[in-house]
């Protein structure tokens, strides 16, 4: 059902990359794991903004995937966006966050499964954008701890009762946390609606 609200298209160099898009307004670019489809979390985010989802399908290394996704985003005429990387898409998101030409606001990494490979530790420390790393309490990985230790402006949060597929298992939680972080960064833990800390 979620897939029905997303339009599909192709963008970028050569034959382009497939993507799914829904909503309007400020843009969130999501890079999801191998062959994934948009989840209810993406649909919820699309209720208050434009969401473009790229899947890590045969895009090569995370570095190459980031380059191609960056070209596709530029071809779509998007100048500024927030970025979300989920699962194996987190590494590509961090490579994209390194691109000097990309005007990226904040970055959310949901259950990252790998580190950046060839990117040296110093390159992590040069990322000045706010980054939030989310880890499910039922599927923690060492990658989240590594991102936390290297990124200068990194926040970390557990999502309870979630494993490695936070967007599928806890879509409301992922959408709420990501939206709050994109909009409020350091103040995101306190909801504007009721002033309560997110559980």
Task: Tell where the protein language model's regions lie, with residue ranges.
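Conserved hydrolase catalytic core segment
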Residues: 79-115
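Catalytic active-site module of serine/aspartate enzymes centered on a nucleophile-bearing elbow/loop
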Residues: 154-199
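Short beta-to-alpha linker loops that shape the active-site pocket of alpha/beta-hydrolase fold enzymes
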Residues: 55-59, 113, 162-163
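Conserved acidic catalytic loop of the alpha/beta-hydrolase fold
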Residues: 64-81
């Amino acid at each position: 059902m979620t897939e029905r609200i997303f339009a599909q298209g192709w963008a970028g160099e050569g034959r382009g990359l497939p993507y799914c898009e829904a909503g309007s307004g400020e843009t969130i670019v999501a890079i999801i794991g191998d062959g994934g489809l948009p989840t209810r979390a993406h649909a919820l985010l699309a209720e208050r903004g434009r969401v473009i989802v790229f899947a890590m399908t045969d895009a090569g290394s995370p570095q190459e995937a980031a380059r191609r996704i960056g070209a596709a985003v530029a071809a779509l005429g998007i100048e500024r966006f927030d970025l979300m990387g989920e699962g194996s898409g987190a590494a590509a998101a961090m490579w994209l966050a390194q691109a000097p030409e990309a005007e990226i606001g904040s970055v959310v990494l949901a259950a990252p499964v790998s580190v950046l490979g060839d990117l040296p530790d110093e390159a992590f420390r040069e990322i000045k954008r706010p980054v939030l790393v989310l880890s499910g309490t039922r599927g923690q990985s060492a990658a989240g701890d590594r991102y936390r230790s290297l990124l200068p402006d990194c926040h970390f949060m557990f999502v309870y009762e979630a494993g490695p597929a936070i967007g599928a298992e806890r879509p409301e939680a992922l959408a709420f946390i990501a939206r709050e972080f994109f909009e409020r960064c350091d103040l995101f833990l306190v909801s504007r609606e009721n002033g309560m800390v997110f559980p």
